[in-house]
């Protein structure tokens, strides 16, 4: 299993809707609205890096209101 944090910049007025849409995806373990340069931070999990990439490009980046993402892989606890 591979985990990553996805930092999301959302369109004006869309952070809550983006976080709600993310929480409906089975790969998303948590999604919260935050302050700072990013609007939403999501923790996602996938079986491998290839699947993780697909989740980001095909499912997260296509959510209405998502403008930009930055992904950081979890390397340890």
PLM feature spans:
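A compositional/biophysical signature of low hydrophobicity enriched in polar/charged and small residues
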Residues: 1-77
């Amino acid at each position: 299993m591979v985990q990553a944090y996805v930092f999301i910049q959302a369109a004006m007025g869309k952070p809550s809707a983006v976080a709600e849409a993310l929480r409906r995806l089975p790969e998303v373990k948590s999604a919260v609205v935050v302050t700072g340069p990013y609007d939403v931070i999501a923790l996602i999990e996938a079986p491998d890096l290839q699947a993780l990439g697909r989740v980001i490009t095909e499912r997260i980046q296509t959510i209405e209101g998502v403008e930009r993402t930055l992904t950081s892989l979890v390397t340890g606890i």
